[in-house]
Amino acid sequence: MYKRQSINLVAASFCEAFMAEGDEVIVSVMEHHSNIVPWQLQAAKRGIALKVIPMDDSGKLDMQAYEQLFSERTKIVSVAHVSNTLGTVNPVKEIVRIAHEHGVPVLVDGAQSTPHFAIDVQSIDCDFFAFSGHKIYGPTGIGVLYGKEEWLDRMPPYQGGGEMIESVSFEKTTFEKLPFKFEAGTPDYVATHGLATALNYVSALGMDNIAAHERELTDYCMKRLAEIDGMRLFGTTEGKDAVVSFLVGDIHHLDMGTLLDRLGIAVRTGHHCAQPVMDRFGIQGMVRASFGLYNTKEEVDALV
């Protein structure tokens, strides 16, 4: 179950069980589309509302504004652990603490954090946590959804099919216990083995070692790029992680990406499935360099 499907599962099943017309979901302005669109689909179907946490020019969430978004109709918070466009590491423990003070559960989108540093869902105390396999060197089309039993037990199945049933008749179907009631059909056991291999690989390297290496590369890249005339860097919060996004002068982001590609440098251009972030900064797209455990300072120098 990859991250997008995981968030769709939570959105559909949680809303079915716990939300009614007029209820509210809190998300942030820096969300990937996969943590916006599923909630919008539910909003259109059920008449619920999305409230959005704003951010400042550095890419830091406005936590005071976040606290003020809660009302008696707020039912769930769904936020990115790390922004895929800005590299901002959001204070998810604080986000969860505030939400829990209001009796509201939290889903954390960990797709951009899980490959880059160690995650402890019990320490974060989030109610749901989702990440993708391909971001952590595993296969595409698979990922993980963690959820607390107290919520998952009360949520109805998201999809129907074989394997997730206890018994079936034309009068009534009963469902298996967790996690099987959410796993309809034959699982992709090949991808499961691939993801397990990837997780064992990064665990053997040590997530703290990976984090230290990538943070060093990120800081070095930010400093080097800042020396270039006309450089505009996006996401300048302290402690940002493994993502450097930028524009240079009046050069279109697609042109910059094409030029770098001809030099053998792989970057991504466009809105990065985060159009509200582009709107926040008044741009159509940006160039994004992202770092993995295999990158080096020499490659940063080649980019610069």
Residue ranges: model-predicted function:
Residues 3-304:
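Pyridoxal 5′-phosphate
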